[in-house]
């Protein structure tokens, strides 16, 4: 089941990124607020608006400064309602260093919004894991940021995020986005 979910997510990622409205690459410096572990997280995101809905995929790889790696894939679908995007989806986490039986799947729900402020675009959101297995780590992530266009299709961004519940982290990031 997990391999089927991962394969479905990767197929969706390939199809979405090929026909995407945007692709982005972000890098965050992350600090665990419990054990002080530091990592660098890289995100590839792609999204498509169609038929009044939006579909997004996120692939995240975190490399820890003292060794170790985490990978996850999330696929979400959402709808804008009064300027707020409500979304839900599914994720797959490969576990620390791909440890045998360390991987798990989860659902997720969230809200995000953004607004232009002069030449900039501000954004914020919140998402939380909906675990169907109580042994899996709980996590709620909040984020906010600002994006600045460089050209009509290219923008750079800076963001802050905070994770709460079982996973407690703070992150500062920068990104590059190309819109089509």
For the regions a language model picked out, list residue spans one by one.
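Outer-membrane beta-barrel proteins
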Residues: 2-180
